[in-house]
Amino acid sequence: MEEEVVLMKGNEAIAHAAIRCGADGYFGYPITPQSEVLETLAELKPWETTGMVVLQAESEVAAINMVYGGAGSGKMVMTSSSSPGVSLKQEGISYLAGAELPCLIVNVMRGGPGLGTIQPSQADYFQTVKGGGHGDYRLIALAPASVQEMADFVGLAFELAFKYRNPAIILADGVIGQMMEKVVLPVQKPRRTDAEVIEQCPWATTGRTNGRKPNVITSLELKPEEMEKNNIRFQAKYKQIEENEVRFEEIHCDDADYLIVAFGSMARIGQKAMELAREEGIKVGMLRPITLWPFPTKAIAAYADKVKGMLVTELNAGQMVEDVRLAVNGKVKVEHFGRLGGIVPDPDEIVDALKEKLIKK
């Protein structure tokens, strides 16, 4: 397939991009608002073209363990779900991180806690960047703010996952998953051959016909000293990721007196709020974390001595704001504005919050 420009939903873009980047398998289960990922893959039937496996599992728990099996054999495999379903996957995600298995997880967030609502939310930030499962592990977390980024981040997530032998997650929200935009789909990449997988993934369970020694994929280590060594090695890897893979976007920050910090769909709304504020003569810039982990701590800290205040806008009760406050270390006032339960604010609400929380005080 050649490069193609189409109008589609963010969820549909995930499915198309997965096929075009040469993914080997998808294992998932339908749940609103991300069901179109599985539906689109079923409609496209990639098993007839690229050979990609697409399977609706009997549950979210089954799906994440199928990902474990596929990733253990060195294959490019993925799953997708929405907030309650991702909670069910947490044990498997911890196992994937502990076994150092590269894979892609997509979370199109909806409101909670509990069953909550099918409307958009960003309340899974803590779960994603602080470790939703057990143990000291990290996920490489990408936060798209457009349908184009939904498509682009699939290939990027796989690239980073295999580079560091670590699970990666695309943390989107229901707005980005359901909205329709023009998207440029990449040229079709072929799936890797078995020989390429063996060469690129010498750690994988690819069989012994090539004469190599057996590989064992596990996160289990019963000797405390060895488990500590594993964890120390993991932390060294995470530090390397933090040093090399931070991504963020800055808009009109050079002359800003105030900074809006937002990710995902809220960054789009925040950018419009920034423009409205500037029309009123208020110099506002915006910083958008693209990687939620590794977090752009240094980039945010650099503005602590340059701006009068920061407003963190999120579709939650205040989660990323904690990382922003840690970044500035008390050097500048940081306030939060959020809407809960699936309500998406207007840009005017953010401007009003900026005035009330930062300017009038």
Functional labels for PLM-detected ranges:
Residues V6-E43:
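N-terminal glycine-rich anion-binding loops that anchor highly charged ligand groups
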Residues G270-Y303:
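Generic long, charged, amphipathic alpha-helical segments
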